[in-house]
């Protein structure tokens, strides 16, 4: 019996919609990363982008457990001396709620060119509306 190795032209991509309202950030992000990588498919191949597209709605209502809302911080750096910026999670939720999910999922993807391509298949929206109705996305439930 031969092992099936998928080629980039053989991969069929689907679109999924995930509602983030009230879901824990880490569990939600792990499920989304799994779909983006394509690990839920039997033809998953390590070096090939086998993943599907994921649309996340209600990103502003994602749950952070415990005191993470106040204590969790996100670091950025401008590249200049003294250019480090620290943003707490509560402030990031007010300004750019999509970034909470985006950063969490990006950290769970491979740190190479394949991961950079896979993160482009993630579409995150703060509210319940999204402009991707033409793709006929399928609604799925993640823990």
Curated annotation (Swiss-Prot):
InterPro entries, sorted: Ribosomal_uL13 (IPR005822), Ribosomal_uL13_bac-type (IPR005823), Ribosomal_uL13_CS (IPR023563), Ribosomal_uL13_sf (IPR036899)
GO cellular component: cytosolic large ribosomal subunit
The keyword Ribosomal protein appears for this protein: yes
Any GO BP: translation
Protein task: This protein is one of the early assembly proteins of the 50S ribosomal subunit, although it is not seen to bind rRNA by itself. It is important during the early stages of 50S assembly.
Assembly information from the UniProt record: Part of the 50S ribosomal subunit.
Protein name: Large ribosomal subunit protein uL13
């Amino acid at each position: 019996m031969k092992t099936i190795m998928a080629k980039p032209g053989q991969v069929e991509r689907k679109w999924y919609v995930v509602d983030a309202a009230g879901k824990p950030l880490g569990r939600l992000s792990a499920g989304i990363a799994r779909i983006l990588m394509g690990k839920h498919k039997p033809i998953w191949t390590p070096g090939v982008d086998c993943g599907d597209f994921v649309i996340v709605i209600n990103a502003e209502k994602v749950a952070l457990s415990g005191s993470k809302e106040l204590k969790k911080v996100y670091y950025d750096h401008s590249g200049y001396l003294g250019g480090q910026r620290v943003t707490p999670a509560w402030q990031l939720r007010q300004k750019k709620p999509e970034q909470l999910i985006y950063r969490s999922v990006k950290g769970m993807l491979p740190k190479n060119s394949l991961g950079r391509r896979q993160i482009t298949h993630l579409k995150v929206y703060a509210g319940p509306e999204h402009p991707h109705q033409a793709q006929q996305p399928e609604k799925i439930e993640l823990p």
